[in-house]
Amino acid sequence: MTQLLERAGTGSTVLHATSRPWASALFQGRRHIIVLALEGVDASTRADRFADGIEEAQWNLNRHFVADITIDDQRPTDNGVQIELAALTIEDW
């Protein structure tokens, strides 16, 4: 979460986060859904920067790696922008 908030910038908070187990025939990991609130006059610009290249971003996780990450929804709010993203993390053997 810390890395996501750093990427989103000052004035960003986690509104909601869920995580559930995920497995395939060869791998196991977790599926995450995270909703971020970006607030402030520059929220729209920060949201665009946050989303730009997120699929190729490098994440430092202990014993896991990010196999997939996507922005599922991005919408304006009264105070800024709300972003919903999904990520799949896989155990790194």
Predicted regions and their residues:
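Long, contiguous binding/interaction regions
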Residues: M1-W93
